A protein has these predicted regions:
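Active-site helix/loop module of the DD-peptidase/beta-lactamase fold
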Residues: 235-271, 298-301, 325-362
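Active-site Gly/Thr loop motif
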Residues: 344-345, 392-446
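Conserved catalytic neighborhood of penicillin-recognizing serine enzymes
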Residues: 250-282, 286-307, 311-317, 362-365
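Active-site-proximal alpha-helical segments within enzyme catalytic domains
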Residues: 45, 226, 315-325, 358-380, ...
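Non-catalytic propeptide/linker segments at domain boundaries
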Residues: 93-184, 191-194
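Structured C-terminal helix/loop/strand segments within mature extracytoplasmic catalytic/sensor domains
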Residues: 22-25, 58, 114-115, 123-139, ...
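A short, well-structured edge-of-sheet supersecondary motif
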Residues: 166-209, 437-438, 444-448
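Active-site SXXK
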Residues: 196, 215-241, 266, 319-323, ...
């Protein structure tokens, strides 16, 4: 009898963990559907609304073909099954996108908050009437509703290359997928100096994409964030040695080691902080509707700041907290306007904090303007300096711990100093799904490649850079 009771107890104890695991699996599957729906809503809203802002057109079918295929598991298998509605205001502008994912919950909502900050995904469970389609959108200064993107680009004059040349052949190879199996190039653009012609720009686009078509920059946004921080440093509002010192850290006084984390540590991906997912996966923030404060700020340190490299979205978001007061007076849209980047939008979480680890939409030409700023050592074509004199050197110089692999890391930028056949001073902004802005100071060249590469594929940016440089005149 005793033996039988013990056996029954053992079976019961074994069953409880199995039941708990089964319940957890069901919760995880439901959460994955909610995240996939948020991803779909935000991509549809961002791609279409930001294109229309620029005077371009993206259809839902185009977004489903490009942005919504080849994404990371498990969302890739879910997204195509989720129905959606695009709700427009009487003006014709997108109000929000609703994606249905569960019979007992409201659809996931991505709401369009206007031309200055674009679309934000709302929290899971937010009611659809949170985004009122009758409420008119604000209009950014100098921007007309519906027919947008008329602002001037960089004031530096540049000519379009016309005759077919060696660079066209490199572009054609990229569009044909020759720089990585399965890669999908949407745009290539090179800006360079030609003797007797000045600044020349040459570009090529996949069908359905063009000069005014924005795409999500993904982690190229990290380099844009580092540039914003440079502008704050130049204005005297911060130094990279400043501790970030969030209020809820300083409340703990000397007992909280996170008070030692500086802007420099965060820009160099060396805060020493832990997170429970790979550093490039912050799905709860990006697609779950959580906020930066909720998801990115409170992780503990596992290593002394400045001693270990760990690529992390959270570190870029932390670095921006170091200039949060400055950003409240000088938001990204004003900074982009100063650079002539009229077709670039930095989006926010629902509290208005900029998700500049990833959530920026921009065109290839605007990103070339961004790269040109570094070739000009932080000076605008008007002659106004907006970055410190040593900022280009700062962001492109390795310091402290470095990543393993083919590329080094500076401060918010990747370094191509390990890439054979590429000038050692080359540095770059890299982003998910094949976003690249390559800056080659010694050749006075900016190279932009946009793509929607599927997960698991890889565009060979070093080979592409070598081929582009070989195709250009050496003056």
């Amino acid at each position: 009898m005793i033996r039988t009771a013990l056996a029954a107890s053992t079976l019961l104890l074994a069953a409880v963990p199995a039941f708990a695991q089964s319940q957890q699996d069901a919760l995880d599957a439901r959460y994955d559907r909610a995240l996939a729906a948020g991803y779909k809503a935000l991509m549809l809203c961002g791609a279409i609304a930001n294109a229309e802002r620029n005077g371009a057109t993206r259809t839902p079918e185009s977004v489903e073909q490009w942005e919504l295929t080849g994404i990371q598991a498990p969302h890739d298998a879910i997204i195509g099954t989720l129905p959606y509605d695009i709700i427009r205001r009487p003006s014709g502008q997108i109000a929000h996108v609703a994606v249905r994912w569960a019979d007992d919950m409201p659809p996931r909502i991505a709401a369009n908050f206007g031309p200055e900050t674009g679309c934000s995904v709302l929290p899971i469970g937010a009611p659809e009437d949170t985004s009122n389609p009758e409420q008119p959108l604000p209009v950014a200064a100098g921007v007309e509703p519906k027919v947008l993107g008329t602002g001037t680009l960089s004031a530096a004059p540049r000519r379009k290359a016309k005759a077919p040349n060696a660079l066209d052949r490199v572009f054609d190879s990229a569009l044909a997928g020759h720089y990585g199996e399965g890669t999908r190039t949407t745009a290539t653009l090179v800006r360079f100096q030609r003797s007797g012609s000045g600044l020349v720009e040459q570009s090529s686009y996949a069908a359905g994409f063009g000069e005014k078509t924005p795409q999500r920059t993904w982690s190229v946004a990290k380099s844009l964030a580092a540039t914003l921080i440079g502008a704050a440093v130049h204005s005297g509002e911060a130094t990279v040695a400043d501790p970030i010192a969030l209020n809820y850290w300083t409340a703990g006084g000397a007992t909280d080691p996170r008070n030692a984390i500086t802007i420099d540590h965060a820009l160099r991906m060396a805060s020493g902080r832990y997170s429970d997912t790979p550093g490039n996966r912050t799905d709860a923030l990006y697609f779950g509707g959580s906020t930066i404060d909720e998801t990115a700020m409170n992780w503990p340190v596992l290593h002394a700041p400045g001693t270990v490299f760990r690529y992390a979205n959270n570190d870029t978001l932390l670095a921006l907290k170091g200039i949060s007061q400055w950003l409240s007076f000088y938001p990204p849209d004003q900074f982009f306007a100063k650079l002539g980047m009229a077709e670039t939008v930095a989006e926010t979480d629902i509290r208005g904090d900029y998700v500049m680890s990833s959530q920026v939409w921009s065109t290839a030409s605007d990103l070339a303007d961004f790269g040109q700023l570094y070739l000009n050592d932080g000076v605008l074509p008007s002659g106004e300096r907006i970055l410190p004199e040593d900022w280009t050197t700062y962001v492109s110089t390795p310091s402290g711990p470095q990543p393993d692999g083919a590329f080094g890391y500076g401060a918010g930028f990747w370094l191509m100093n390990r890439s054979e056949g590429v000038p050692a001073d080359t540095f770059a902004a890299f982003g998910n799904r094949g976003q690249y802005v390559v800056i080659v100071p010694s050749r006075d060249v900016v190279i932009v490649r946009r793509g929607e590469d599927p997960a698991g594929s890889g565009f060979d940016i070093a080979a592409f850079t070598r081929d582009v440089l070989a195709a250009l005149p050496t003056n």
